[in-house]
């Protein structure tokens, strides 16, 4: 009787070990996208000369403590001229697949400071989603408020060219461009060769670790790889 009980317990123990082993062996890398890890967060340094994305919500190491970066332009052209691209900090470990009927949700917190005067050289804020070096979609955001925090929200349908993102080449990037007339400390638009005071503008990009309630992230409708 005793030997029979021991045998039953041994079988149960072996069975439970076999069942648990695969689950315990599986590890999830927080820096890699997956169907359960779909949000790409953005961080950067104080002057946005370096900005990057990471799927790890705690991956803010090296980012500005204030939770944002400012590009301040006061150059000879007396304009706010921004052309910034943020890319993923790490390459994909494997190809990423999106739900073909889903949406890519793009959100960024920004703040602009420039003159409200208009010129032929003006360009509204443009945000471009890129797949590696290839432009996927671009959208202009006209008539944005000056010197106020702005939460940009842009939902983008998944298209045929965005259902699959290949590793080591198709990692997502986001690009910001804007060109506007600057102004000086008196609040007067820049006046070219007649300008006396230092003149320019600024562009602020909030990062995922900001304390102002602004969101800077991209959510992808990631699904499991299709069966071959």
Describe the role of every protein-language-model region.
Residues 10, 100-104, 169-171:
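Glycine-centered small-residue hotspots that permit tight backbone geometry or close packing
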Residues 112-118, 136:
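Long, amphipathic alpha-helical coiled-coil/dimerization segments that form elongated scaffolds
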Residues 124-184:
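Aromatic- and Gly/Pro-enriched, solvent-exposed loop/edge beta-strand patches characteristic
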Residues 10, 36, 123-125:
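Residues that flank catalytic or metal-binding motifs in active/ligand-binding sites
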Residues 28-52, 60-103, 107-113, 177-228:
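Proprotein-processing/basic-patch segments
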Residues 1-30, 227-228:
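Secretory targeting signatures
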Residues 101, 116-126, 130:
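Short coil-to-beta strand junction motifs in C2/discoidin
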């Amino acid at each position: 009787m005793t030997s029979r009980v021991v045998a039953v317990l041994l079988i149960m123990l072996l069975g439970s070990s076999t069942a648990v082993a695969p689950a315990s062996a599986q590890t999830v890398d927080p820096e890699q996208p997956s169907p359960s890890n779909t949000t790409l967060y953005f961080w950067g340094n104080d002057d946005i000369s370096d900005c990057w994305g990471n799927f790890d919500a705690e991956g803010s190491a090296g980012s500005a403590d204030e939770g944002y970066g400012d590009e301040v332009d006061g150059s000879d052209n007396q304009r706010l001229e921004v052309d910034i691209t943020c890319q993923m900090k790490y390459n994909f470990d494997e190809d990423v697949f999106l739900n073909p009927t889903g949406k890519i949700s793009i959100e960024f917190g920004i703040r602009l400071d420039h003159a409200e005067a208009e010129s032929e050289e003006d360009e509204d804020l443009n945000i471009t989603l890129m797949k590696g070096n290839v432009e996927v979609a671009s959208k202009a955001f006209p008539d944005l408020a000056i010197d106020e925090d702005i939460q940009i929200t842009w939902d983008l349908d998944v298209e045929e060219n965005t259902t699959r993102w290949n590793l080591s080449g198709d990692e997502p990037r986001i690009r910001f461009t804007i060109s506007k007339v600057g102004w000086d400390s008196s609040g007067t638009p820049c006046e070219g060769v007649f300008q006396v005071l230092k003149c320019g503008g600024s562009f602020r990009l909030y990062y995922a670790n900001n304390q102002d309630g602004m969101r800077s992230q991209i959510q992808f409708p990631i699904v499991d790889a299709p069966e071959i």
